[in-house]
Amino acid sequence: AEAEVMISIDASPPDYLDHGATPNLIRMPAEGTRARWMTPSYPALTFPNHYTLVTGLRPDRHGIVHNTMTDAGIGGFRAADRNAVADGRWWGGEPIWVTAEKNGVRSASWAWPGSAASIGGVRPNRWKGFDDTVSPTQRIDDVIDWLDAPANVRPKLITVYLEQLDSAGHGHGRDSPQVRRTLGEIVPAIGH
């Protein structure tokens, strides 16, 4: 049986396909699928949008309304705070990996927002936490290892979060040489 792999290249608008360094992304729709368009949730920030993608709920319904927020009963939440992102009390709704696991379908996640927390007592069967020192190539190698596992332990649903393009864009500007170079590093990693 095949596996579903959902890869997010954070902050990658469709016109990045025109930068010329994306042959793997151009090839992928022929072998898999690609969204024709997306309407971001509001606010258009990483954590609210990524959790919306895996729950199907708007941020005001799943509770992750910003990358930084405060709740009088829980305290503060910052995307960079490992303890906060691992606290299941923040994460409402049911992400697809929880639904999969509840139905006997193994799942895995490489740093997808929400995957660090036990949600309803369930986490992905395999999981890697956010670590910006791990390259896109190593992350994809980990996914390949998951896919190469024996059938009885192989995940059938995998989510992978790649933040490098977003970081380069914030640091140097959307049309900077650094963004083009970062895109040129990420895309070959996905297709290797």
PLM features: what roles do these ranges have?
Residues 2, 10-13, 36-38, 49, ...:
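Sparse, context-dependent recognition of short Cys/His-centered cofactor- or disulfide-binding micro-motifs
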Residues 2-6, 14-22, 39-47, 86-93, ...:
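Solvent-exposed, acidic/flexible segments
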Residues 2-14, 27-29, 53, 100, ...:
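Beta-strand elements within well-structured catalytic alpha/beta cores of enzymes
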Residues 3-5, 34, 106:
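A fold-wide structural signal in alpha/beta-hydrolase
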Residues 15-62:
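Short, structured active-site-proximal loop/turn typified by the sulfatase FGly-forming signature C/S-X-P-X-R
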Residues 22-26, 150, 176, 191:
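Short, structured coil/loop segments at alpha-helix boundaries
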Residues 36, 81-83, 192:
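Secreted, luminal/periplasmic, and some membrane-associated catalytic domains
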Residues 57-185:
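His/Asp/Glu-rich, glycine-adjacent segments
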